[in-house]
Each structure stands twice: as structure tokens, then as C-alpha cells.
Regions:
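Beta-strand-rich interaction surfaces with strong enrichment in secreted/lumenal proteins
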Residues: 10, 21-24, 108-110, 121-126, ...
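Outer-membrane beta-barrel and related beta-rich outer-membrane complex signature
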Residues: 63-69, 148-150
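Ligand-binding face of N-terminal immunoglobulin V-set domains in extracellular IgSF glycoproteins
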Residues: 30-59, 64, 73-81
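N-terminal, polar/Ser/Thr-rich
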Residues: 1-33
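Short strand-edge motifs at loop-to-beta-strand transitions and within beta-strands
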Residues: 116-120, 132
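Short, hydrophobic/aromatic-enriched beta-strand segments in well-ordered soluble domains
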Residues: 36-38, 42, 55-57, 130-144
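A short, structured loop/turn motif at beta-sheet edges
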Residues: 27-29, 43-48, 104-107, 124-133
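Extended, low-hydrophobicity, Ser/Thr/Pro/Gly-biased non-transmembrane segments
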Residues: 75-100, 104, 111, 137-187
């Protein structure tokens, strides 16, 4: 579908995902809870037997690839205070998506959780031009940004107030492209 230049060719297509999201930030527990409806339309010429969602917050699970492969000393010959602070925080933090519920058109979905992604197996192939509606409920605790240095979390101040930083915070459809298929590499 693409010429040698890499630009889209004459048969280019692009998938469509429309989101309706409701979110609640609980300042006291430093957590968020959300529900969303994703209407996903298959504009590719292929029949899809499954779709993938990105669950970026699962990077903070104790058994995530990131945590299992990261040397806690940061790869240095010595350990600094910020590295010890991160390790101490992560040792007691219960991270990742909690209470994850996924339905397709109102029916519990058959899923395979794979780290920072989840594969949603469809009961029938999703043909070109067809849409499905995914209903997703979820919650997770926020990390302390000063300890973990993440794109998502909270920062506390001496006066007792917090600033909340939210990026990559909701389950979202993984890219499905004409040149790579599903972009489901672990985050």
C-alpha cells in the first residue's frame, strides 16, 4: 500500500476510534477511576478477529517487563538517593490497572492480558466498514512523580496540596496500520 518513499499510497486506509470517557480523580487516595465507550470502525480491507488496547499504566505493575528488566541501581556503579527513593516507592506500590472490565456491545469480552496491552477476541470477524462498541471500566493508583519520574502521577507540596499529572491515562485502541498491522510492542 505504500511506495518506497513511505508515504500513503492510493489504497491508503486509516482505522477510526471514537471515545466517550468519564473520569473521577480521588485526591485523598491519589487514584483515578474511569469508564469509557470506544466505537471502533474497521476501515482496513482485512477482517479483524481481535483488537488490541494499550494499557500503559500496567508499566507500574510489579511483574511488568519494565520493572523486571530494569536494574534497580540504574546501571551505574553506585546508587544515588533518587534511585533508592524510586525503588523504595515501587517496592510498596500496587500499580497498574485495577478493576478492569471490558464488554463488547454489552457482553463480557474474551481477553488475553499481555503486559501493557490486552487483546480482545471478537465473537465474529469485524469486516471492512463495520463497527463495534467497547465498554471499559477501570481504576488505578497514581505514582508519586518525584519518586518515579513518570509521565503520570502526583507531586506533593509542603502545604499538603498535590498537583496531578495525567498522560497516557486511559485504555486506548492500539494502532493498526497498513504497513505494520497491530503496533502492539510492549511499553
Amino acid at each position: 500500500n505504500r511506495p518506497a518513499t513511505g508515504e500513503p499510497g492510493p489504497n491508503y486506509w486509516q482505522q477510526r476510534a471514537d471515545y466517550k470517557i468519564k473520569i473521577k480523580l480521588d485526591e485523598a487516595s491519589r487514584s483515578i477511576q474511569g469508564s469509557e465507550v470506544i466505537t471502533y470502525t474497521n476501515n482496513s480491507p482485512l477482517k479483524l478477529n481481535y483488537v488490541w488496547l494499550q494499557l500503559d499504566q500496567n508499566i507500574f505493575e510489579k511483574d511488568s517487563i519494565n520493572n523486571l528488566t530494569r536494574p534497580w541501581w540504574g546501571g551505574n556503579n553506585s546508587v544515588d538517593f533518587s534511585t533508592l527513593r524510586r525503588q523504595n516507592f515501587m517496592d510498596t506500590f500496587d500499580g497498574g490497572f485495577q478493576e478492569l472490565s471490558i464488554k463488547i456491545n454489552g457482553k463480557d469480552a474474551r481477553v488475553n492480558l499481555v503486559g501493557t496491552h490486552v487483546r480482545i477476541n471478537l465473537d465474529a470477524p469485524l469486516n471492512n466498514g463495520e463497527s463495534i462498541e467497547l465498554e471499559i471500566d477501570w481504576a488505578y493508583a497514581l505514582v508519586e512523580e518525584n519518586a518515579v519520574r513518570a509521565r503520570n502521577g502526583y507531586e506533593s507540596f509542603e502545604d499538603g496540596n498535590d498537583i496531578f499529572l495525567l498522560a497516557q491515562w486511559y485504555p486506548r485502541i492500539t494502532v493498526f496500520s497498513d504497513y505494520e498491522g497491530w503496533h502492539n510492542k510492549e511499553f
